[in-house]
Amino acid sequence: MNQTIEEKNKALVLDAFETLFYKRDYQAAEKYWSPNYIQHSAHIEPGRDGLFNLIRSAPDTLRYQHQLIVADNDYVIVHGRFSGHGPPVAWIAADIVRIENGRLAEHWDVIEDEARRESSKSGLPTFGDHFTG
């Protein structure tokens, strides 16, 4: 059975994130990120090197967990949690990635601190089905 472009792109993004965030294999990660990678995040220096340098500078305890991934043609959105990066609370992010020629070519994100039970006006967690900690 043939995969749709959306299925292929979701798998590509998850493989790329695992290679960079978990394995920290920068040489292998180069095959996933375009050398002309465009970075729109206000939190990350420009280009592929900006992202790779950010991860190099992050503590070894950095962890990324995705919860939801959706795709529309060459765009993939991943809802995830970054933890172990230093601040007392995790970050919840929606990462939007554009794929071009089988590589991550462009990135946008929205990041917020993970809500704690006492600060969640909705009474619901911002990631997963339960509060952490």
PLM features per residue range, with description:
Residues 1-133:
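C-terminal and inter-domain tail/linker signature
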